[in-house]
Amino acid sequence: MENIGLPKSIKPRPYWIQYISAYIVFFLGLFVGKIKVQGRRNIPKEGPIVLASNHFAYFDPFLLVYAIHRPIDFIMQKELGIEPHFLFAPMIYGAILTDRNKVGPSIVKQSLNTIKKGKILGIFPEGGITSPTLTEAKPGAVYLASIANATVLPVSVRGASNAWDNIFRGVRSRIHVNIGKPFGPFDVKGSKEEKSKKLEMASRELMCRIAALLPDEKHGDFSGDPSIPVYQKENGLQTI
């Protein structure tokens, strides 16, 4: 089924709508699959938070709301579109639409506004559902976290790729959501070259921290990175 474009009317919804939606999502999650969430203790209780997760399936945002138990304003790339039967989700819950090639002033403004309201900003650093394994991150997540002086919360989601089809087959998918140790904020100040290098290094650290929450076969571009075992030990979560 071909993706359709995202309406321009999509924008972050009021807190009360997202709050009620989060409760609805919690109950729906009981039917979607057997969802195992690890690491809720790692969610900061206060302060600005940027949640960064891998993106293997359309159900990922839904599962992140289920796992975090708090409203999240997700950034979505308007060019990628969405499968028609999932359009209801961003229409009701809302999202921040962005251009895949740049982080414009309006995106920065909306993102900072989200954080000032005490909500979590949700970002998929890879830029969309691009691969069944991890790929290189775009610098947007780290950049927004740096200007907001926010803590970054790495999260992994797996097992939801066939969840939609399994629902109609009467099968509940086994889904795992792992929440890692928060890190940051970042300082990416300096010359253009220094800033670019800092963003690149911080983005790689972010993806390696997400990789540490996933089984080895999902590490993709980050397979064999020596920092992953260090983060795995730090998290102390099961990734099998």
Whereabouts are the PLM-identified features?
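Non-catalytic C-terminal accessory region of glycerolipid acyltransferases
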Residues: 1-16, 106-240
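Short amphipathic alpha-helical segments and helix-helix/interface helices
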Residues: 25, 64, 141-145
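A secondary-structure boundary/capping signal
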Residues: 39, 54, 76-77, 124-125, ...
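Residues at the C-termini of beta-strands that transition into short coil/loop
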Residues: 41, 78, 99, 156, ...
